[in-house]
């Protein structure tokens, strides 16, 4: 069990992708003082110490893999707890929920909560990013016409521009900007993706190079780099994708979510190495898995 003092000691490394502020009394007090409506949104008139302790307990639950508890504790505080709650809920949905309908419901719940409370959390890059992340994951699995009808691509592009402006060293945001164009190509094809949304291989390379230079050694970022190369280039970048997936699989995880990411990378690495042995056979099914394009014959 992670203690509050251990949480503080390891916080900077745990959040090395984002440099997210530690929720101690000084930080939370300043946050509430500068955002009176945020303070008013906390249910049951909780004291400052209660809010701080609950936030820290929520993060402890997240880092030790108790995602449901972390989510519940975060939501019990209202919008100020959405950062840890959204992170926990999207992680559970993305890595552990096998049922498609339930997975989609979890992502949609995050989007609905964010839509209702986003005016309270403009300061919070964690909340904003994982609302984006839920939309991105949902967009991967629902049909292209629905994605287009809801203008998800435009909303996600705008969210990333704003996040990058506010937090230019955020590794999650930089990686997402690279993955975004690859995801568009995966969903719509190269021609439609380029003509409609300007998706390009250069964007993938540009943002992942920025991530690489920051050298944070985050398994999920390496995993997503590998996936993006395959979505954008297919077999041409299979060996490079394998290198990035291997890197992801060899990271020593520091907490529960990273352990899930490393485990997932190891599983995908085995698949990709088998595909490589077969000279690319099976790659189309790999790339289109869990999408509405899964059963269509073209790459």
Which residues does each predicted region cover?
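Alpha-solenoid repeat scaffolds
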Residues: 80, 84, 96, 184-188, ...
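A cross-domain feature marking catalytic cores of carbohydrate-active enzymes
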Residues: 90, 175, 223
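Alpha-helix N-cap and loop-to-helix initiation/capping positions
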Residues: 101-105, 147-151, 195-203, 236, ...
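N-terminal alpha-helical interaction modules that lie
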Residues: 1-140, 153-167, 242, 247-299
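Short coil/turn linking the two alpha-helices of tandem helical-hairpin repeats
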Residues: 91-100, 136-147, 183-194, 226, ...
